Amino acid sequence: MEYEFRRNSLTGTFLATFSMDHEVLGQWFSEELGPELAKIQQVLDSVTEILAGKRESWQLIGSDLTLEIDREQARVYANVLGFDEEYELEDAMSLYDAESEAYCGLEDFEQALLSWQEFVQKGI
């Protein structure tokens, strides 16, 4: 999993871009997490607790995307994917899940999160 962090010099916004099959992680970092150091630390603390065996799993529901982490992996998915099965869209109308959901190993996610934290701290 490759990623790149940038900051728009005109608007000051922070942007994360992740490799193919992980694009939604970039959206989550950029839009749901953003440059909020307290929120970044909250997620890091939860990852640390899970890796230490103090917690089984953790979830952070955002406005558009949700993060779920457990002992094995991190999953980010669009909240719209959580709709009730009886209301599923027809095949022709189905969502492109590859851009709406991504998984990565928990250690890889932690490393990306630490890199994001460092990037944001330097940019503020």
Curated annotation (Swiss-Prot):
Q: InterPro entries from the xrefs?
A: UPF0231
Q: Which Pfam families match?
A: UPF0231
Q: Family, per the entry? A: Belongs to the UPF0231 family.
This protein is called UPF0231 protein Sputcn32_0682
